Amino acid sequence: GPKEPEVTVPEGDASAGRDIFDSQCSACHAIEGDSTAAPVLGGVIGRKAGQEKFAYSKGMKGSGITWNEKHLFVFLKNPSKHVPGTKMAFAGLPADKDRADLIAYLKSV
């Protein structure tokens, strides 16, 4: 698979992360259920990219990523740079704290 990103992920606050999820992510992503707009994100930590019932891009399917804190931290800063060709039409979360909080929330669900 791809190399592990060389980043240190700060401690995040899951409740702040939930607010970020609700405002930035929930228009497309759900935590559970059968959303078809975007992959369902409950249990995403430890999951191989491109697994859920979703028509993933070739870039995502072929990325070889197993989602962990470091990959999410880098991906969420600039999705199309980390996984070229991704269908995720989101510019990214520039603030390290926002990404750390969102990851803390995703770890909790």
Swiss-Prot record:
InterPro entries: Cyt_c-like_dom, Cyt_c-like_dom_sf, Cyt_c_1A/1B. It comes from the Eukaryota. GO terms for cellular component: mitochondrial intermembrane space. Binds 1 heme c group covalently per subunit. Heme c binds at residues 25, 28-29, 88. Electron carrier protein. The oxidized form of the cytochrome c heme group can accept an electron from the heme group of the cytochrome c1 subunit of cytochrome reductase. Cytochrome c then transfers this electron to the cytochrome oxidase complex, the final protein carrier in the mitochondrial electron-transport chain. This is Cytochrome c. It comes from Tetrahymena pyriformis.
